[in-house]
Amino acid sequence: MSNFIFISPNFPTNYWQFCRELKNDGMNVLGIGDQPYDELKPELKDSLNEYYKVGSLENYDEVYRAVAFFTFKYGRIDWLESNNEYWLERDAALRTDFHITSGFQTEDMPRIKYKSKMKEYYQKAGIATARYHMVDDFEGCKKFIEEVGYPVVVKPDNGVGASDTHRLSDEEELRTFLTYKSIHPPDVSYIME
């Protein structure tokens, strides 16, 4: 029987259905989460072979120990997944640390997390992508905008969804954005398209 660890199987609330179908397919479904077992939906409880509660999914050491426990108890882990973009890097680190080869590893993260790195892979696949510039200073951005014209869209190079996305339509908005960037986590890299 294959062992499948599902990280945070309770969120979103409909994810129990993934666990049910994995179990129906003959997998040994093992959940790791920070919600108390007694608060899990009955459907989720029925879909898991075992659940390990951690204090916080943000604490890598706790989650690591939970995976180690399941490995000791059930043997080699074949799959580990959360189906949640927020946990992509955590999932990859656990797969790498436990030699679980059925998914992204730590070394794969840049090409799937950074918009600028994704473009290279889209181009290799023949998918057109918008030209881009990594936001640096006014002169560098202005030079790029002279090539492509306004409006441009600026967003974090490594980000989930559309949060912190800015549409710039003129030089004044460009200056306003660059001021914003200098005060709001200045270590965040932005991509301009």
What is the meaning of each model-derived region?
Residues 1-107, 139:
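ATP-binding N-terminal substructure of ATP-dependent carboxylate-amine bond-forming enzymes
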Residues 24, 47, 128, 146-147, ...:
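A generic structural signal for short, non-catalytic loop/turn and secondary-structure boundary residues
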Residues 57, 112, 135, 168-171:
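Conserved aromatic
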Residues 75-77, 149, 187:
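Short, high-confidence coil segments that cap the C-terminus of an alpha-helix
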Residues 95-164:
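A conserved helix-loop-beta module that forms one wall/lid of the active-site cleft
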Residues 128-131, 151-154, 167-193:
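Conserved ATP-binding module of the ATP-grasp superfamily
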